[in-house]
Each structure stands twice: as structure tokens, then as C-alpha cells.
Amino acid sequence: MKKLVLLFFFTLISSSIIAQVQDNVTWSTSPNPFNDSEKIKISVSGLDPSKWSTDDVYLWTWFFDSNDVEVSSQINWNGEWNNSKESMKMTKNSDGTFSFEFTPTELFQYEGIGKIGVLAKAKDGTGDKKTPDYFFEVGRFDLTINSPKINPVILEREGSVNISVSSTNEINYYLMNGDQVLFESLNNKTFSKDILGPDSENDGIKLIESITLRLLCKDINDSNNFINLNFDIVVEPSSIEKEPPFELHDGVNYVNGDDSKIYLQLNAPNKDFIYVLGNFNQYIKSNESLMNVNPLNNKFWIEINDLNENENYWYQYEVFSKSPVSGSPTVVKVADPFSNVIISSYDDTNISLDSYPNLPKFPKNQSGEFTLINQLDKYNWNVLNFEKPKKDDLIIYEILVRDFDNERSFQNLIDRIEYFKNLNINAIELMPLMEFEGNESWGYNSSYHLSLDKFYGTQNKLKEFIDLCHENGIAVILDLALNHVFGRSPLVKMWMDDPDNNSWGGPSNENPYFNQSAKHTYSVGYDFNHQNELTQYYTKRVVEHWINEYKIDGFRWDLTKGFTQNCDENNYDCTNSFQQDRVDLLKSYADYSWSLDPDHYVIFEHLGSDNEEKEWANYRIDEGKGIMMWGKMTSLFNQLSMGFSDNSDISRADHKSRGFNDKRLVAYAESHDEERIMYKNLNFGNSSNSNHDVKNLEIALERMKALGSSLLLIPGPKMIWHFSEMGMENSIFTCEDGSYGGEDCKLSTKPQPQWSDDWTLLNKRKEIYEYWSKIIELKINEPVFEGEYELKVFNQNKLLPTIDIWNDNLSGDTLKYVYVISNFDVTKKSLILDLPISGEWKDLVNNEFIDFSQNSSIELEPGTSLVLGNYLDCGSFDSDGDGIGDVCDDDVDGDGILNTDDNCPNTLAGSTVDLNGCEIFTLPLDNNKVSVTSASCIGNTDGSIGLSIEDASYAYSVTVTGKDD
């Protein structure tokens, strides 16, 4: 049914949806039988809408043509699956039935309807609040098509196609080409006629070119009672083998300096011939629209000419297979799998013109999806060479554009740039933007990975947002779901298993891209076989496109456990264990990303075993690379925020605990896929202390500050989910109306209280935002966080974690030590500080200086944290005149021996010393003085040192250079 086409992902992504299908219903229609131009009344009985928590019932309907092929219409009479149109509301009758009256040709705006599909549903059908599909045949007399069983049908050049129809009534049959009658059979229950190919030696109706023949079937007693059957007969073309003028890549190939011409290439193994149908050729199959075959690689290609650079063009492929595998169609119409923009009969009617102005209308009398050739309005980038933030410094802000602001658009993000800047985050991660099925989605149900989904805005609007982020020092990371696709993908449809011929199905056994059954246990959609060269080529083209076209700074690879061929959909142990094939494969994808952009961020959502994850985290780490790994810490940090010691050990937020050689762990407390911290604080928090009840909103919000300190100040990359910085308490299971709906509403669009209630001005929420902003700024700007650290969790009280941070490479009057301690208990705690040095420490959040000994004791209020920093005072003495106070100088006497190794400190200038810093020879003190007067490029071979030497009678000046020549 149509709902499966539009919102198939709802039934796949959420595995625990509670079924609410009402099976025991009965359908009827009046009159029965009926023609498509008659007004009919459809009724359903045995339905109890109270099981769906509603009193109202809506009809959801779709239709098929006279050849029993489902029609994809650009007219949307139903509305959305989660929001049916009021015009489709059924009437509740006194006998308990529900009914709906309509004229099929008027509702569907289509003539020649052969069958109507119906179901009844709640206005929001999410969670299977519906009845099963039911079908009504259209027509006042019965007809059975005996052959051909498929439509269109291929007519081989020397072959024939038999058109055979039968009825229980005597019928007048007229086989017609347009208005011309080619053959008639009167007063018969059956009709049969052979149609011959152009090279056939038999006599009869011979076709030279492809054509649609119409069989008019009339009631012999009522000429107004008739049915038209259409048969699309495609004459097999003569094959054309021809090399293209230059090497093409799959998809659209533009010609430099010639906007009037493009080349298209499609790789379609096991297909026999392909037509390109578009608005540039009026969608007509002809020799001019037939693709050539490149004899060097067997790929299909075509040259398209006479294009106007100021117009939009679109096309789709009509792909033919003379001998498809059992259950697969002879012909499919698909958009280009390498499309950059799609125009769709399924989704486009519900896309706001505010977000996507000048959206081309879907072409009349066409179906499916088309590739838009968009050469208009090229974007001019302001930032050409963005310097990415260091991996160690990343604070990533994860966003679902749909739920960020009311307009659900890229423009919303642009308008909120000051919000991002003031929070001081330096990276934004956008959940998938690739063309996905439906409009309101998380985006993981992708069908075209190179195509931008139009629901959020135009290509240029996304580029404008990325450009603006780069202008403000913010990197943009894109979530990439490349372990699977969904059913509208051309890569599925060209080789699909479609035994009921309804134009939908999973991969057939000849599909070169997909496994028929998933090779891992977390599969949704259809599982890519990434050991296949075609899949690897497709994946690399996706990576190349988003890096080069959109200047994307990094990818978060979704569900990398799915990149293996070694397991099956039922073996969790296999999926979760080390798999060498995916280790090697994903390294190769990382290598390819780095070949395009050496500083590209590669992030894996693997959530697997340490022995596998460290293979990636440590990969090419000596080159400054290494793959960053998602580190889910939700339940552990949530236990802390709720005030419970059990299962609250956050020591795994330390990259060293996982065997990583450097800081490549993206630890997080919240992500798009987890229950919200604040929701659990308010509903399940520790309420044992009435003076500090975590279920109290003010207290729960206050504790979010400590959570920020304990997570974000751990050195290395970190991630936050949007609006956790203001304590968003809506559950992940919140419905669009703000109610709690369980799994049914996990994927639902969320309300926007952060803007409608202006949270940025509310004291407590503003405090969290400003607090997090301070510690994020500290984390990003202070080089101490690029040093070493120890995350300490004490077995006797896990609610008091500490982070000890230092950087021995720092010198001078700078922040060299940071000490973070938190109290997640619900009572005040007296704590012993384990500071590395005694002296003056600074409260880095409140800007207060405090004197501490190394083992000072402090009292920390419940749900709070203290962030201390030690700035070294280098003193006013500078014995060797190098500009570094003696306290901080590694070589105070300037004899070339570090203080730590100098057994003879304060050696006089002019002395020659041994390895222990003790003098071997010194100029006489009474009449000699040697000093360094200048130095340049210290530590390099082309520097110089100027010396001044004085005695009682003479002054000397010597310059010593280190130049190689």
C-alpha cells in the first residue's frame, strides 16, 4: 500500500513498536460492482477506534491501473501517515460502521482505474493504528488478463507477444493504436492476438517501434459500460556499442565550457537496454533516448545536447531486462543512483516553498522519481581554506535539523549562529541530510546518499550554513548511514525481488550491491555488501561528493558493526566480536577520506569491543590521524546526575581505559538515540534528601552544571546533544503534541519549548548554558587540556569523580594544572583534595583565587563541582636573561644543562661545563665578561648567536652561525 512507500522506515527502525492493527473488520461498497466514474460508498464494520485512543477514523486509499499496476500519483489526497487530511475523515453511522463516499476518478484525478486499495486508520497512524489492506476491483464486468502477465513487455525483434483476455460475459473487443482499430473480436468471451517483432517472418500485426496498444472492452448490451486495458509493448532495440569521447564517471558528467551538453553513465550489470526519459525529450523512448554500451566496461552512457543553462532539466532511467531472474521485473523506472537532487512524486507536495523556493513540480503523467540536473545558482564560498579545530579540542554539538527549530530548515541554523558562538562549541554534527524516505525523519532511512534531502532547504542554503560556520571557527560533521539503504534506492529497484509486480521489493539474488539477508544483527533497510567493488565505488563517490561539493569537515559513520560479511541477522555474538574484514574495510574508507582531505575527521559509531575499536583509534596515530570512536556513557553519567552510586563508574570516559594510544574517544552523556538525562532526573532521580530532591526541576537543572564539568573537561573530543546545555527534559519518546507516547513517538517531531518559552532568558536554564559555555571555552583555548590526565573514580564513593589534568610541555606564566572534582551525592561532602602542588589555585569558573595545600580539605555542596587551575608564577628573577622567570625556566643558569640534571646550578657565564653542569674551565673573573647579546632561530641549523666578550683592554664581538653552507 502507499503508506509502505511513504513511511516504510517507521516499521523498520523501531523494532519494539506495539502492534495495534485491528484485523477483524469487514469491508463493503455500494454499488457493487462499480465503474471508476461512479460515486461509491465504502463502509467498514467491526472497528473499535477506542483501541487507538480516539473516536475518529480516517480512510487511507490508493489505486491501480487497469493492468493491476499501482499508480504513483503526484496528487496527495491522504495527507501524511501521522496526520491524515480532515477531508478523509470517515462518517460514524448509527449501526457502528464507518463510511466514506467519493468518485474514484475525481478523488484520484485518473481514468482507467482497475483496482482500489483501502485501509482505515487513526489520524496519526504511527504504531500501526490501522486495519489491514483491502482491495476493491473496479468495473461492472469481470476481465482476466491471461497474457502478457507483465507490463511493459519486451517484444524481441524476431519474436512475438500474445495479448490474451477473457471474461465470463460476452464482450466486444477492439485492439487500437490511438483511434485506429487494428483488430476486433465481437461477441466473444475471449480475446487473443499475436503482436510481431520487426524482424519476424510471420504475417500479422508487426511493430517497428515501441508503442502502447489499447484494448477497448465493451459490454455488448451497454456501450457506456466499458474497460480500457493498456499494453506497453517495447520493441527490442538494436544494440549500440560505442565508446564515450572521454572517461566518464557514473551519474552526470558536465563538460567544461559547454553548459549545453552533459553525459550520463549508468552501471547496470545484467541489463539489456536502457532509455533516458526526461523533459528534454518529452519522456519518449526512441533511438535518440537509447543509451549506448561502452564495450570497454559494459557501462551504459548517453550524450544529451541542446540544453539551456537557464533552465532546470530532469531525467530518469527506464531499465530493461529480457530475462530477469524469477520474481524480478522486466522493466523498472528509476532516478540516477548518483543524483545530487531528487524530485519525487512521494514527498515533494509536502515540502515548504519557504524552505525550498522554486521547487520544480513533478511532471504530469509520470511516476516515481527523477534526477534534477541543477546547474543554476552556483555558490561562491567565502572561506576557501578552513583550518579545522584540533581533534583533542573538539566539542561536537549534535543536531537533528527537524527538531532544532520550528521551521525545520537550514535557515533556522543560520539564524542561530550567535547561539552556537556564545556556547563556544567548535563543531556541529548534523544527523543525516541525504535524500531519505518521507519528509519528517531522523534521516537514517536514506535512499540516495549523494542527494540532499529538500525538506530542510536548498543546496546553496546548506552551503551558506557551512560557510558561516567556517567563518566562525566551527567545523561541520555529517552523519553518514552507509551500511544500508531503503527501498526507493535505484540500487535496490534495478535488481529487486518483486513477485507481486507492485514495483516494490527487496534485493534479488542477482543484486550486485546488497545481501538478501543482513550479515549483522542490527540491520534496518537493505544491507550493503561492502566487500563488493561496486559498493566500494559507490561509497567512495559519496565521500568525495560531500567533501568536495559541500566542504564537509568530517563524517560520523553510523552503525559500523554492519560493515562485515561474516555474520548473520541472528548472531549477536558474531556481530559484536572482532571482525577483520570490517577492520580492514573501514581503514580503507578512512584512508580514502584522508586522501581527499588530510585533516578530515573520521568518527565511527561502533560501540563494540576494545580490541576492535583500538585498531581504528590507533590507526596512523603517529601521523596525527587516528579514527575517533563514539563512546556511549549515557547510563553511567545519568546515574551520577540522578544521584545514585550503582553503575556510575565513568572511568571508561578515559581513552586509556580502552587501549587507545591518544585522545580519540568521543565520550558523550546524551545523543539522538538515548533517553534524555533530564527526563530521568525528574522522573527517577534520588529524592531521599528533601532538601536536595533530584526530582525537583531547579535542583535537577543545577546538577547539569556538574555533569558538564565532569564530562566536557576530560581531555579529548566530546559530544553534546542539542539543548542538553539548557536542560531539555522532554523524553526521547515525546510525541509531537508534547505528550509521552512510548516507542510509538520515538521518531516523532518534537515540540520546541526552548524557543517558544525563550529558555535563553530563564535564569536556571541560562545558568547552565553560560556555565557550559565557560568550561567549553576553557577546554578549547587552554593548551593544558592537550596534555595528560587521570580520571579517578573511587570505589568507596563513585559519586565523587575527579579529573587531574596537566601538561609538562608548557612553560611560562600559563595554566599548567587543572583539577576537577564533583559531588553527585545528594548531601554535602567533605573532600580531601589530591592536588599536585600547594599554593594559590584559581576557581576557573568563578574567577576566585584560593590557597590550597596539596591535601587540603573542602566541603562541596550536593550536585556541584569545583574546577581549579594553577597558574605558575615565574618570578621576577631572570638569571640568564632569556625572558623566562627562574621559577619556570628549565635552565636557569643558561649553561645548556636542564635544572633537573644540573648538579652545579648558578654556573657563571663563560664557563665550560660537563654533562652534570659543573665547570671545566672559566675565564678569569677579574677582567673578563662573556654574554649572549642576540639569538635567532634557536634549535634550527640556519640560526645564529651573537656573543660579546670584554676584558680590561679590548672588546670583542663574535657571531656564530649554524648555516649548513
Q: Model-found features: residue ranges?
A:
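Substrate-binding/active-site clefts of carbohydrate-active enzymes
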Residues: 361, 376-551, 559-578, 588-597, ...
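Proline- and Ser/Thr-rich low-complexity, intrinsically disordered segments
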Residues: 879, 888, 892, 920-965
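Basic K/R-rich, polyanion-interacting modules in nucleoproteins and related proteins
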Residues: 232-274, 334-392
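Short coil/turn motif common to extracellular beta-sandwich-like domains
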Residues: 35-39, 154-162, 256-263, 932-946
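Extracellular calcium-associated, cysteine-rich motifs in secreted modular proteins
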Residues: 874-925
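C-terminal beta-strand-rich structural cap/linker in extracellular carbohydrate-active enzymes
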Residues: 853-875
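Aromatic-rich carbohydrate-binding modules that target alpha-glucans
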Residues: 56-109, 179-204, 255, 263-311, ...
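Conserved alpha/beta catalytic core and glycan-binding cleft of carbohydrate-active enzymes
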Residues: 551, 584-729, 733, 780, ...
